[in-house]
Amino acid sequence: RSEQIIGTMWDEIPRNDIFIATKVGWDMGPHNHWYHPEHMRVNMERSLKNLKTDCVDLMYLHHCNFGKQEQYFDDAVETIRRFQAEGKTRFIGLSDWSSDKVMNFIERVDPDVIQPYRNVMDDTYASTGLKDYVEANNLGICFFSPIKHGLLTGKYTEPATFETGDFRKTVKDFADQKLIDKMKTNKSKLEERFANHPQPVMHGLVDALLTDAPTGCVLLGQRNVEQVEAAAQLGEALSNEDGDWVNGLYKG
């Protein structure tokens, strides 16, 4: 649905003004694993049709689940490289929740961009060696879940319950009153520290991730105009001092 919405924009916004990323490997289709070449092509062609474009800018391997013996790895990489050779994508990316998994495959995939899980509470970017690899190879880096599904913003006052199928239902921290109280306290501290910024809480949470990532960006889910306008005010990396201070709030 999101791709279809984006595909309606090209009469008003030039396609070349927008950098589009999509992914393959997010559903198995009729197969018993994530990276069957035929279904990767089905997903790729569906995305191009939805987006009303002949080529995306970036196409990710959505995760590093290539089979217990990595038996689907070669086909996955060969297929996405074929898409690139066919002019269906300009760049190739690799993503996973685990930076350790990314590190296990990064040299063999040889991606242009990495998309790891990272926020100021859950951060293995440096400790796994991913940061050093990204810098040594001048890769793009796009961090996902930067506000941990909203939990880090301090907007929750008590344990939350979610409907079946909502991913947040699997995040145990939403049931931790002590942690929720800490997030509320941290929210107040961010508002005080960055009072001169129009989005003080988001500035602290999001822009701290850019302090040590000069080739980086942060992926924020945006469901309404207000969230888009807030996101547009972010993206300036914190100073080392401010970044260390923010990280100390959530790791202390």
Residue ranges, per PLM feature:
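N-terminal binding-site loop/beta-alpha segment at the start of enzyme catalytic domains
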Residues: 1-18
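Active-site groove signature of glycoside hydrolases
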Residues: 48-67
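Short, acidic/polar
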Residues: 35-52, 97-104
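Active-site mouth loops of central-metabolism enzymes
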Residues: 24-41, 67-71
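Beta/alpha (TIM)-barrel catalytic core signal, keyed to glycine-rich beta->alpha loops juxtaposed to Asp/Glu
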Residues: 9, 64-252
